[in-house]
């Protein structure tokens, strides 16, 4: 304190002692006591020194107040810092933000057991475990949570067999031929009907009498319509009958129709040599025709010569024609197998009955079915792989197909999921088919070597 010794009193000494002990709370009290004592001393002092002493006492208390406040503030800060260090931190697990997050799900335990139980206690068994065993015992793993579509089909590759060299490259054409009549190839038709006329220039330059037609002619007729010899085929027109002129006649009333021609043959049969009313020229001509047919030279006769002999006035009688044709068939069937002769004779009988019924379309279908049933035409189309004409109804989630490699045919199917996965699955199937075909080729080659 900057107060002179002569101005100190007993009251000031007590206030200073208290301020040293409690500087925070007793600062104002000491200042007030000092002011009161100074005022009393000024009143008792002489008038000359009153002004200077008053000014000195007013300036000293302001400096003491600011210094004490700064010291008290520093002491309070140090005390609070010590209290914070001494106080322990709160547990972060009990914070409000973490309390809002739910506990993680135990998917591994819940997926391996189909029965409800208390997961916290660790007891996953239930009262139904005796009746329904858990899935974990059956070695079945459930799909992950992100998989929502489960397929019922599994990828499969099946070996169908080995295709012959004469089989068509288009193995399964059921989708292309659906709703269309079946048209056999040229070799099959010629084998079933050996005397059917055929235009040899219809498929030039792709014509091959013993092979398969080109791809653009598979579903098209490759031969002229079948005409029962010696019936001539009348011209057909696409103009409706109502728009034709007065001279035009419908095809049914034409002189080339089957009914009128059959009536002419019946009328001519009365002049046959069997009835005894035929002329000598007709008898000689019939004998020459039968002699030529027995040798087989009539089969090589040109179409112009045959048509010239079939004039309306010189028609061959029905009985004589049947006799000649039977002789021709018997001569030609000697060089054929037993099965082919049986099918040919049966088809001939059916053709003979169909002439009297005037149903050529039905006759052709019956003859074809008969040849297939008897096995007279052992072609690979009917014997090797029999394909159904009905289209296969595929599931929208299942892809099916066939792969032919080195005359080996493989069928495959796998479920559809996505474009990338489907492509990888197909490529893996192609790799498997490639490896299997190589193994089959090696086995077949080794088998041929051991057989030789």
From Swiss-Prot:
Bias type Acidic residues, positions: 61-77, 362-372
Post-translational modification: Phosphorylated by FUS3 and KSS1, in a pheromone-stimulated manner. Phosphorylation reduces the affinity for STE12.
GO-annotated molecular function: transcription corepressor activity
Residue numbers spanned by region Interaction with FUS3 and KSS1: 212-452
Subunit structure: Forms a complex with DIG2, STE12 and either FUS3 or KSS1. The interaction of FUS3 with STE12 depends on the presence of both DIG1 and DIG2. STE12 is lost from FUS3/DIG1/DIG2 complex after pheromone treatment. DIG1 and DIG2 have also been reported to interact with CLN1 and CLN2.
Biased composition (Basic residues): 81-100
Localisation: Nucleus
Biased segments, Basic and acidic residues type: 349-361
Phosphothreonine: modified positions: 379
Low complexity bias: start-end ranges: 331-348, 378-395
Organism: Saccharomyces cerevisiae (strain ATCC 204508 / S288c)
GO biological process terms held by the UniProt record: cellular response to pheromone; negative regulation of invasive growth in response to glucose limitation; negative regulation of mating-type specific transcription, DNA-templated; negative regulation of pseudohyphal growth; negative regulation of transcription by RNA polymerase II; regulation of filamentous growth
Skewed-composition ranges (Polar residues): 12-22, 35-53, 107-116, 124-145, 269-281, 291-307
Purpose of the protein: DIG1 and DIG2 are negative regulators of the filamentation and pheromone induced mating program. DIG1 and DIG2 inhibit the transcriptional activity of STE12 by direct protein-protein interaction. DIG1 colocalizes to promoters with STE12 and redistributes with it during induction of filamentation (by butanol) or mating (by pheromone) to program specific genes, but binding of DIG1 to STE12 is reduced by pheromone treatment.
General remark: Present with 5000 molecules/cell in log phase SD medium (5480 according to TAP-tag study).
Keyword set, alphabetical order: Nucleus, Phosphoprotein
Major site of localization recorded for this protein: nucleus
Record GO cellular component, one term: Tec1p-Ste12p-Dig1p complex
Location of Phosphoserine modifications: 45, 126, 142, 272, 275, 330, 395, 428
Region (Disordered): 1-145, 262-311, 331-395
Protein name according to UniProt: Down-regulator of invasive growth 1
């Amino acid at each position: 304190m900057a107060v002179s010794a002569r101005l100190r009193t007993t009251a000031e000494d007590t206030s200073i002692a208290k301020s040293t002990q409690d500087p925070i709370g007793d600062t104002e009290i000491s200042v007030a006591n000092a002011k009161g004592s100074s005022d009393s001393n000024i009143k008792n002092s002489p008038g000359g020194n009153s002004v200077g002493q008053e000014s000195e006492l007013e300036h000293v208390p302001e400096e003491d107040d600011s210094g004490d406040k700064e010291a008290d503030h520093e002491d309070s800060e140090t005390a609070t810092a010590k209290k914070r260090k001494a106080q322990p931190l709160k547990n972060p697990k009990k914070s409000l933000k973490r309390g809002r997050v739910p506990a993680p799900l135990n998917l591994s335990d819940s997926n391996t057991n189909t029965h409800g139980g208390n997961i916290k206690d660790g007891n996953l068994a239930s009262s139904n475990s005796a009746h329904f065993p858990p899935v974990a015992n059956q070695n079945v793993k459930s799909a992950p949570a992100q998989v929502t579509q489960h397929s019922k089909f599994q990828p499969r590759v099946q070996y169908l067999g080995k295709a012959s060299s004469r089989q068509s490259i288009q193995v399964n054409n059921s989708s292309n031929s659906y709703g269309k009549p079946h048209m056999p190839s040229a070799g099959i038709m010629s084998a079933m009907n050996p005397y059917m006329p055929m235009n040899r220039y219809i498929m030039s330059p792709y014509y091959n009498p013993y092979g398969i037609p080109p791809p653009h002619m598979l579903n098209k007729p490759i031969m002229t319509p079948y005409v029962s010899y010696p019936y001539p085929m009348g011209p057909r027109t696409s103009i409706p009958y109502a728009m034709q002129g007065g001279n035009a006649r419908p095809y049914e009333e034409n002189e080339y129709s089957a009914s009128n021609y059959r009536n002419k043959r019946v009328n001519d049969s009365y002049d046959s040599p069997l009835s005894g009313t035929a002329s000598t020229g007709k008898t000689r001509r019939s004998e020459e025709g039968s002699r030529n047919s027995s040798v087989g030279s009539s089969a090589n006769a040109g179409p112009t010569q045959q048509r010239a002999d079939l004039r309306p006035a010189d028609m061959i009688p029905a009985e004589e024609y049947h006799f000649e044709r039977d002789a021709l068939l018997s001569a030609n069937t000697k060089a054929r197998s037993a099965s082919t002769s049986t099918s040919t004779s049966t088809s001939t009988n059916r053709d003979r009955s169909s002439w009297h019924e005037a149903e050529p379309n039905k006759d052709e279908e019956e003859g074809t079915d008969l040849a297939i049933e008897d096995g007279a035409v052992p072609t690979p189309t009917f014997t090797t792989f029999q394909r159904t004409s009905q289209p296969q109804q595929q599931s929208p989630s299942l892809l099916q197909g066939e792969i032919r490699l080195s005359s080996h045919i493989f069928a495959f199917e796998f479920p559809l999921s996505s474009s990338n996965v489907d492509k990888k699955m197909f490529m893996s199937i192609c790799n498997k088919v490639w490896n299997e075909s190589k193994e089959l080729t090696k086995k077949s080659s080794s088998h041929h070597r051991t057989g030789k």
